[in-house]
Amino acid sequence: MHKELTIENFKCFSEPTTITLGKINICLGCNSVGKSSVIQSFILIRQAFEKARLFKDTQVKKYHIQLNDIYGLQLGDSEHIKSSKVKDDITLKLDEYEYKLMSIAESPMEMEAANEYDVSVQSLREGIFSDGFYYLNAERTGPRNYQMIDSKTINHCGVYGENTMHLLNVLGTVSRVDSERCYNLDEGKTVSTLNKQVEYWMDYIIPGIEIRTDDVLELRVSKMTLRQPALDTDFLSPYNFGFGISYVLPIIVTGLIAERGSMILVENPEAHLHPKGQSHIGYFLAVMACSGIQVIVETHSEHVLNGIRIAALKNKVAPDDISINFFSLKKEGKNTRHMVEKINLDERMNLENWPEGFLDQEEEDLRTLRLLRSKGI
């Protein structure tokens, strides 16, 4: 498990900024304060490692890192993502592994990185250097009647969840889920096949939904239909059920199939979910993290955080295994600086520090309502 990520000269992080990591890591804060930059840093490190692994038996020691169109990255020009014109490189350090990304004059949409480490040794490490690396973009695929089947063998849902239907159809009845990840909140739900465990967890997050998938190989498409047993209808198009199911399904499938010792990056798991569903997806992600997967979550939802805290208390997770990082802007004179503050938890999962702006909007709104009412408005 990785312990520490340091970012320098990348987007809003002009100075070296270190983020402590645990089994499950939550990035919280307002918009445009650096949360997504953390996710992108992991992706750039992963890409540098993959290039080094590809060329490990060659004389190539420096690699071109793509800034766009890989793992969903859309970073644009290399000069635009440096936070300082004085510094030439972007520095990303994960534990003892440090990567310096340099601009390439003739190819501004790429950067050059060297890998000074033994790739064979790195590959034995868990986390970002393991075979399993899973990333789900905030802009996941919405309701679709079908998805195209990738011509390559796939073992993940895809950055946008675009492989989810096919993967579930192929593995649903033949793949067994590790006992630590199996749904354990109902003694009657004990079948460990992937399709049943997906059904159990989906019912926990969005109650009363049944899923059916099928491949039409001659057309190279996977189909999905949904049904609510409470209604007297047959299986229907996903378009009849809104965005929540389509957005959360890849998260559930990814968590259940991810390799032990791997890493999952998830942006906005709460998207299109009711607050109860947001809490429950947080609970699910915490359970996955307890089973030996390092989870990185970028979220705006206090409900996701509370679901994680509930799971941690219920499953006796140590406070140090949960890393809550609050991203904010701090004014210092005429200047504004990006800050990352770790929010500590005690043994009872109480938040030990509560900086200004941290999940306090409800309190602010209630205060405003009281003030307006006192003025007779």
PLM region spans:
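Short, solvent-exposed loop/turn segments at secondary-structure junctions
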Residues: 10-12, 26, 33, 60, ...
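Phosphate-coordinating catalytic segments in nucleotide- and nucleic-acid-processing enzymes
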Residues: 4, 48-250, 254, 259, ...
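Pre-Walker A-like glycine/lysine-rich segment at the N-terminus of P-loop NTPase domains
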Residues: 1-48
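Phosphate-binding P-loop
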Residues: 16-22, 229-230, 256-260, 287-289
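Walker B catalytic motif
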Residues: 266-269
